[in-house]
């Protein structure tokens, strides 16, 4: 059987239009089929089907050549990386005129991309956003099934953004996407590292492996004059700065030795009305007021300013954040006739719960009532830690279901309960709507109710099915706001 070098296939793609497929059911005569390795189902199993449907070339690993039949095998070590190379040629994404800014980290990605979008729109730019809530650019918007799209979909989106005259793109880059090479073939003008706290350890072996997945955004996607910024207020950001000396740091602590350039921030005041911050970078000092609350949002604002200064903006441009009202499902206030302080937030990790509950605690609410749960078929080790965070910072803990998926909600709740040992008051109710109703009945003026875990989501996954469910809609229905 004749083999074909990858370079030759790339030359063929440059000369003529050949469809690239990763799903054998979509194969057309003369196309390229890339057999992606998988954790549950391996793409190599579908090579015979792709060949029978007319695939001309099969990108595969050495041990899969025997299945290629009449198709020409392209043997590679990493089919996922190769897919990105081919997609870059097919969609011409190597010649994009718009800069792409990638944001990675456990928490803060969505808020940072929204803040960047708001800032650059205020400057008159046509912006694109790819992230947890939506994929959107001028003339297009759709709900996001994945934080970071699959490789072919991502290249197709970027190509369309270019056609639609998008001028700058802000992209959330998840650890899954980095591990699975979904962003292969993409050149980033700038990258941001926010933080790293426990999450996704059902996927990554441990925190070290989780960190190395995130760090790939800094190491494996080189581009000319790449801007790299990272928080120095957490150990993982400082570790990253040791590995990448060019990083520009930001934080509220004194400048660490790992970085030569550092955006230093101070919180001058924090209240229910918002934040008053002071920043200094090199010889410049400026202040900023915003309706956003919480230290975590102050950190998000530092990240945005750190990279924006490198993209040519000036401190006076940041005054637009005085009118920034927030992100859907991120400490989102539910306005109601009873004037109760009710918030919905996406917090679904121990650290995210600590951040949002601390923000509410710091602005002086009398009591904090928290409705929360843990997702099924996800990192079980974080469940008691989430309970511990809620017990420490809430007056009433209402434990319920999140997206139970294929686990028994009662068993998920049982995993959380050890962390709630020191809670002042515990209510358990697996039915999420009933749990929210019980929590609302407990709220008095001066209290804060936080409904955590689902944020912007409009479905609840039970088993393999997704059912319509929105925390915001449920709250409004209970309060008669609809």
Swiss-Prot record:
PTM entry text: Carboxylation is probably crucial for Mg(2+) binding and, consequently, for the gamma-phosphate positioning of ATP.
Record gene name: murE
GO terms, biological process: cell division; cell wall organization; peptidoglycan biosynthetic process; regulation of cell shape
Residue ranges annotated as motif Meso-diaminopimelate recognition motif: 402-405
Keywords, sorted A to Z: ATP-binding, Cell cycle, Cell division, Cell shape, Cell wall biogenesis/degradation, Cytoplasm, Ligase, Magnesium, Nucleotide-binding, Peptidoglycan synthesis
Keyword Ribosomal protein: no
Reactions it catalyzes: UDP-N-acetyl-alpha-D-muramoyl-L-alanyl-D-glutamate + meso-2,6-diaminopimelate + ATP = UDP-N-acetyl-alpha-D-muramoyl-L-alanyl-gamma-D-glutamyl-meso-2,6-diaminopimelate + ADP + phosphate + H(+)
Localization of this protein: Cytoplasm
Function: Catalyzes the addition of meso-diaminopimelic acid to the nucleotide precursor UDP-N-acetylmuramoyl-L-alanyl-D-glutamate (UMAG) in the biosynthesis of bacterial cell-wall peptidoglycan.
Name of the protein: UDP-N-acetylmuramoyl-L-alanyl-D-glutamate--2,6-diaminopimelate ligase
UniProt cofactor(s): Mg(2+)
Gene Ontology molecular function terms on file: ATP binding; magnesium ion binding; UDP-N-acetylmuramoylalanyl-D-glutamate-2,6-diaminopimelate ligase activity
Residues binding meso-2,6-diaminopimelate: 378, 402-405, 453, 457
First-listed, main subcellular location of the protein, grouped into a coarse class: cytoplasm
Binding site for UDP-N-acetyl-alpha-D-muramoyl-L-alanyl-D-glutamate: 24, 147-148, 174, 180, 182
